[in-house]
Amino acid sequence: MRMKRIEATIQHDKTGAVSDAIKDMVGGFTILEGNGRGSGERQTIRGGRGTGTFVAEFNKVATVSTIVDDSKVEAVVNAISDAAYSGKAGDGIIIVSTVDDARNIASKKRGVEAL
């Protein structure tokens, strides 16, 4: 059976909704928080001591990563897309790529069984 890696870079405040949407669909997932710069509007930040405001160089984002067998890809991608959607530029991007093999370190299982 073939496997796919799904990586979704989303707005930081959507991680809870995305987590809730996929937690019962996948064996596990990882969320990495970071900063990103894309098409969305960046936050305006007030300077210290009333010195004015400036536009942040980056937005707070999160990348949700999981590996699933081919049969689950469409459902997981749709769930992430629906949960992360606001209709504004900067909602994020979902990338799906092929995974040749996976190995569970603790159980020594390989392929889809490792998931």
Predicted regions and their residues:
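Positively charged, small/polar-rich N-terminal and surface patches that mediate targeting and assembly
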Residues: 1-115
